[in-house]
């Protein structure tokens, strides 16, 4: 609902300006243009509001990610490369989170609370991301004509948690500081996870075309 969105966006903006600890229900209600009773009726206390705000922002990030990464074609497309699609999705996801202005600002103001909220309290956000990734896994295997993993959701959760960990705990390897290094890591580690270990051998055999649809 429009009121819920207004409240969540007001909360995120207020958190980024003064921090979570210093944000009151009145601050959020005033910024959203609603009364305090409406805010409590919709979201209850601060913990529920914070969790809902995280999930709302995760949805916006995932929407932006889907805009940046090409869809998997329904039919044959000689120019579509599943491995490149996975590399692009991973690299863009890492970049979006690392460059996220609101997240970085909130980490500066309330680093400990954000760390807790984005780890212990990130269950719903990770589940949301995992569902999106699992759908992409199914689509990629459909396009290639290969058997998907027994449980694409497990793989979706694994990749979501991998990206989440790499972004929230930078340093110490792997090196993802440049687009080139992030793409290299995605090609050698993430692509085999998503498409199967044989993709590395297939790509090596077809260096000029990368990984296309297997011929029938």
Identify the residue ranges that each predicted region occupies.
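Hydrophobic alpha-helical connector segments
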Residues: 52, 66-100, 156
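Short hydrophobic clusters on alpha-helical segments that form packing/core surfaces
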Residues: 7-15, 61, 65, 93
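Short, hydrophobic secondary-structure boundary micro-motifs
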Residues: 103-108, 115-116, 146, 175-176, ...
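Basic, helix-initiating cap at the start of DNA-binding domains
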Residues: 1-31, 47-51, 56, 72-80, ...
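Short hydrophobic/aromatic patch on the recognition helix
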Residues: 32-43
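Amphipathic C-terminal alpha-helical segment
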Residues: 95-99, 135-139, 156-177, 189-200
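Amphipathic alpha-helical packing segments from all-alpha helical-bundle domains
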Residues: 62, 84, 105, 114-145, ...
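N-terminal intrinsically disordered/low-complexity leader segments
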Residues: 1-2, 72-75, 144, 196-216
């Amino acid at each position: 609902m429009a009121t819920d969105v207004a409240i969540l966006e007001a909360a995120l903006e207020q958190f980024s300006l003064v921090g979570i600890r210093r944000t009151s229900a009145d601050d959020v209600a005033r910024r959203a243009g609603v009364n305090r009773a409406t805010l409590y009726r919709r979201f209850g206390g601060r913990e529920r509001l914070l969790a809902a705000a995280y999930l709302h922002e995760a949805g916006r990030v995932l929407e932006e990610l889907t805009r940046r990464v090409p869809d998997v074609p329904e039919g044959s497309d000689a120019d579509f490369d599943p491995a490149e699609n996975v590399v692009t999705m991973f690299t863009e996801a890492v970049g979006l989170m690392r460059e996220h202005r609101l997240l970085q600002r909130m980490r500066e103001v309330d680093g400990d609370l954000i760390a807790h909220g984005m780890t212990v309290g990130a269950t719903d956000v990770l589940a949301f991301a995992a569902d999106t990734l699992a759908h992409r896994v199914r689509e990629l295997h459909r396009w290639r004509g290969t058997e998907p993993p027994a449980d694409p959701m497990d793989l979706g959760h694994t990749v979501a948690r991998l990206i989440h960990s790499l972004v929230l705990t930078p340093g110490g390897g792997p090196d993802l500081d440049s687009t080139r290094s992030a793409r290299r890591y995605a090609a050698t580690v993430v692509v085999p996870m998503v498409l199967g270990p044989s993709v590395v051998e297939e790509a090596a055999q077809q260096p000029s075309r990368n990984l296309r649809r297997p011929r029938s």
